[in-house]
Amino acid sequence: MRARHQDLLLIDVRGDSMEPDFLHGDQILIDRRDINPFQPGPFCLWDGDGYVVKLVERIPQKRGWYRVFSANDRYSAYEVNAEEVRIMGRPVWFARRL
């Protein structure tokens, strides 16, 4: 991957909503150039309160809406208008303590 440092964001995972994909304490590198959920998958979102990493997919029947869900099925999915969140980018790398 070739990216300028200003195109990258490094965040720490807090919580268990994305287990088993990402664990509490993991560090995730976000490519801020990849902000279109045309291909569903994990994205970093800014929800107004902070960064969250969730699985995101467009809802074809509802233009401008996303379905947001966790890898951990103990958490409920929800729908959100694209104007209510900001997609910060897609995870491209992560680090985990051994």
Regions found by a protein language model. Give the residues of each.
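Acidic/glycine-rich C-terminal interaction modules and beta/coil loop segments
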Residues: A3-L98
